[in-house]
Amino acid sequence: MAIEFKLVPLFGSGAVLCRRKEVRVWGTAADGQTVAGRVTTADGLILSEGVCTARDGRFLLHLPPMEQAAGCTLTVTCGAETCTSTDISVGEVYLASGQSNMELELQNADEGQDLIAAHDDPLVHYFNVPKKSVWDDDAIAAEAASHWERVRPGYARDMSAVAYFFARKLARTIDCPIGIIDCYWGGTSVTCWMDKEALEATAEGQRYITRYREQGGDKPFDQWRQEEDAFWVEMNAWNAHVAQLKKDNPGISWPEINETVGPCPWHPPVGPGSPYRPGGLIETMTKRVVPATLTGILYYQGEDDTAKTEHYDVLLTAMVMRLRQLFRDDSLPFLNVQLPMWIAAGDEDKHDWARLRLAQARAASALQPGGLAILLDCGEFDNIHPTDKRTPGERLCDVALRVVYGMDAPESPRALGKYTQGDTLVVTLSAPVLRRETGELLLEIAGEDGAYHPVQSVTLAGTEMRLRSVAVLHPTKVRYAYVNWGKVSLFGRNGLPLAPFAFEG
């Protein structure tokens, strides 16, 4: 069968190409064919052009860096055939990945419906990677139909709300076209976004692969499909029962729900088509846009890994290092969202979200250039999907402004270290903090026995906090906000919350 000459949809009309970097453009063509591409302005000025030879049914053009532009045309030719994409912009391009809180669409977020109806922003564009966990005919058709959209009245309802607020603020701040490549799936572990090479690079990743196989991950596809269909029958019935209970009994707690209808049957069965299998979605989603030229990666994930926090930072670091290889940029900025506060009604605080936040912070320190948007003052009690997505999106933009663009933007104060003075433990900070009258202190100190006690006396002096408790005569350890849910009271002068921390050495 002859190979059709065509561009992948990522470079269709309305696309945003990355400015000031070599731009990689690809598609399919017969082996040995010469393929030429160029980007031109509306008046015919050539901004960039390149030539390549197709191999293995694929061509990959390397177009020299371009400055910011709009209203351009991308023309790619192969012999007598031509592919033309119009309304091309040259600006900043970010991959937005993760799980459900990145996935939450603008139409379901606070302010979303009003913004969808009225907001017209010629600078903000987005491309939704089809959510497919199996590469089959349906996935091929979905990819062929995928396309870029611009934020305009009546559109953007299916755009990631976090990415929308990020892009809107960034576009307004730097006055540049912003392209968002949405690539996410709710309920996923970090391991879903790691390929086999990344998983096998660490002992932690290898354990996930072994556990997956032990749980029956290598079962025949048809068997998995039958189990999957049966699971969703059960899951949908459970959801229907819960919805009816909430309707009939407003304010009913989750323990009462579980006692009435039984615990939630989540997770779905493992198997070769499951979106939750390790190494799956990176193949069927992320790699469909590899090796695009990116400005950076936006990431909001971790809720599904709170039961396995001890290795999360290692896995997250391995994931990012592999993505930097795939996208051919060893210094690709990784901009992450730290988990907010959350607990389900009736649940005991097991501190697993607190441990996950600390793991995210450790990974952030190792993944430079990069940064972490702190959401310790955010979150909704008993709602794991808070509908305020402006705050995480705009704080993530502030991280980008500092890390990517070298601009002065608000940043949460951080703990830099600690030392002991007699019965006082002193924490040094990156910036002064203030204590608000509302909220909890959430500071604990411990001695060599490791038994933590609430701080009873705190003195804030410049960039130091002096902490004491009558229960700890010689404090050597300290932790802050080591809870899944709480109301913080320590903020920087810029209004941003102090980042959580733990010094236990």
Regions found by a protein language model. Name each.
Residues M1-G505:
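Cell-envelope and extracellular/periplasmic
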